[in-house]
Amino acid sequence: METRGRRPAALQHQQDQPQAHPGQRAARSAPLHRDPDYADEDPAPVERHDPGPSGRAPTTAVQRKPPQPAKRGDMLDRDAVEHVTELWDRLELLGQTLKSMPTADGLKPLKNFASLQELLSLGGERLLAHLVRENMQVRDMLNEVAPLLRDDGSCSSLNYQLQPVIGVIYGPTGCGKSQLLRNLLSSQLISPTPETVFFIAPQVDMIPPSELKAWEMQICEGNYAPGPDGTIIPQSGTLRPRFVKMAYDDLILEHNYDVSDPRNIFAQAAARGPIAIIMDECMENLGGHKGVSKFFHAFPSKLHDKFPKCTGYTVLVVLHNMNPRRDMAGNIANLKIQSKMHLISPRMHPSQLNRFVNTYTKGLPLAISLLLKDIFRHHAQRSCYDWIIYNTTPQHEALQWCYLHPRDGLMPMYLNIQSHLYHVLEKIHRTLNDRDRWSRAYRARKTPK
């Protein structure tokens, strides 16, 4: 008969287990990861706070460490150092160029690091990370314009897909304006290639025969491009573009304004393909009472609507003065407003160049505007027939200002990137100024009075 309340007999070889405290957990088994040579059979329990009589562990049983900053490895990896080095080379070149300008006295001096090593050592993590992002943005800007350029970095076209092409050529006598006009057509910088070229002068007899032959040869040259295996490929729908010389008085005849008139010589040519109108030595005629501004804004759209084959309309006007006083009919003023391109000879009078640059560089920093004026001054001292071109509606912002060199071709000036780099120089200047101000304040506070 079993006795109530008696504990059952313990099993053989079983040790008595002490009764656990109600507020304590059961004893844990030995940890999994232990050194086998120094494994303790009965490791001591981890020291902890007494849970107290309530049996609940306090909320602050395990003391938490204060938040620690994340461990950082090297401040800059290899790619970041490459970005900073590449950007530093550009910044150093721009800074030296600005300091060497004759007009550098009017610019605010910018503080900068003495060398690349000083920048990498003392720049600080925040500034260096900012420079890395800025150089990545510069690379993106260069990659965006790369499809519009040839392999040598020159522009493949002056207008690309822009239509109509209304351009003004500014230059004094003897600067090569006539040669520039022929080169634009022969080098296929105007697209599409015109099939008919109208050369308009005050009088037909004043055009020398040698110049007429040069026009005929160069527009024929511009109609072909080299092909494979020594072949040539026509660039238009004709094998020989037409060259038509006209007097200015024939241009302003009434029937030449009406595209539906069968006597309109421009409509007849537009029915066959693209056309180009060249006005040379006509500045005095344009300043007269007869208005011809229709050729700059209304006439192109009418030709495009009526003649689908006329896929290109180009008007290039030569002016000897950037601001002529005589403009009774407003032709020159309307021409400047409608013009998409301004081709400027660096040999123009400096006062006229400065006025033009001040007008069309409102969005650029003052330093870049002065740099552009210095570029004009530099090319004016050379004997080459260089031209600087301003495009009001460029295919890309980097192509807004270009220069045309007889050997290098049409090269973009990248003034947008130069402006971006100048803003980076200003950022470095502000950072160094802040550090100097903080250092002065710290020394003033620590210096005993």
Curated annotation (Swiss-Prot):
Induction profile: Expressed in the intermediate phase of the viral replicative cycle.
Binding site for ATP: 171-178
One term under GO cellular component: host cell nucleolus
One Pfam short name: Adeno_IVa2
Region ranges (DNA-binding): 440-449
Keywords: Activator, ATP-binding, DNA-binding, Host nucleus, Nucleotide-binding, Phosphoprotein, Transcription, Transcription regulation, Viral genome packaging, Viral release from host cell, Virion
Deletion phenotype: Empty capsids are produced in the absence of packaging protein 1.
InterPro entries: Adeno_IVa2, P-loop_NTPase
Cystine pairs: none
Molecular functions per Gene Ontology: ATP binding; DNA binding
Domain of life according to the entry: Viruses
Localization terms from the record: Virion; Host nucleus, Host nucleoplasm; Host nucleus, Host nucleolus
SUPFAM superfamilies on file: P-loop containing nucleoside triphosphate hydrolases
Location of the region described as Disordered in the Swiss-Prot/TrEMBL record: 1-77
Leader sequence segment: none
Complexes and interactors: Homodimer. Part of a genome packaging complex composed of packaging proteins 1, 2 and 3; this complex specifically binds to the packaging sequence on the left end of viral genomic DNA and performs packaging of the viral genome. Interacts with protein 33K.
Family per record: Belongs to the adenoviridae packaging protein 1 family.
Function as written in the Swiss-Prot or TrEMBL entry: Component of the packaging machinery which encapsidates the viral DNA into preformed capsids and transcriptional activator of the viral major late promoter (MLP). Binds, along with packaging proteins 2 and 3, to the specific packaging sequence on the left end of viral genomic DNA and displays ATPase activity thereby providing the power stroke of the packaging machinery. The activity of packaging protein IVa2 is stimulated by protein 33K which acts as a terminase. May be the protein that pumps DNA into the capsid powered by ATP hydrolysis.
Protein name: Packaging protein 1
Native species: Human adenovirus C serotype 2
GN (gene name): IVa2
